[in-house]
Amino acid sequence: YLFIKNNTADYGGGVYARYEGEPVFNHVTVIENTAGQGGGMRFRDNANPIISNCTIKWNISSGAGGGIYCNNADPEISYTSIIANVANEGGDAVYLKINCEANFMNTTFVSNGSPESDTSSAVFCVTNCSALFTNAILWGNLGPEIEFSSTSNPNFVTVNYSDLEDGQNGIVTNDNGTISWLDGNINENPLFCNSWDWDFSLAEDSPCVGTGIAGNNMGAFDVGCGPMMSINDDLPTQFSLKQNYPNPFNPTTTIEYSL
């Protein structure tokens, strides 16, 4: 296990890889790093990362790509959580700039973005990029879950067996790309065990349990707690207040109230 923490750079606060190669990250936590581009990680020019079982959390970019910034790179990301990253110029979790092909398998995107930013989006695609989401959870991020640039070449996104907040409406194409919305997608609260304490494992009764491809779970984490307590919503919808009796009265009376 490796922690990459509290670093500052112009590009790639925690990691910067460039030129041909396939850097592999397994069981790595990239946390609380800061950069001008790619607060957590930055990849470009065919540095195609393989990222699995990782946590990318609380990173900040003063430019684009709070968690991960890719330019002409093809990331493969699986069983990874991308949590509470912030970028001032889009792509709070992931920013795909030019000619990127991204594959997200069992990845959890949650709480990315800042209320102080008017460019928030969890995943932002600029030009000629494609992104495939399988068994993914995109929930509780500020701004669109996925957004395309409105001014560059078209982008393409495929979503299957994933939980995406607001469903297809959570994807903003700006009339500049295509959505392939395949089987198995849902728009339901994933029922994280304790998001207040940054625990994004799934409750036993989460709609993401067993509903991914081949009966797998959605997201980066397995079941981590029992079922959530259900709230009884069988509340009264009508009431009546009857005439008091006797009427007139002195000194007492009875008023009947029923639900």
Question: Residue spans of the language-model regions?
Answer:
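Generic secondary-structure boundary/loop-capping signal
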Residues: 183, 189, 197-199, 215-218, ...
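Residue-level marker of motif borders
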Residues: 186, 212, 240-242
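Surface beta-loop-beta hairpin patches that serve as ligand-binding interfaces in beta-rich domains
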Residues: 196-230
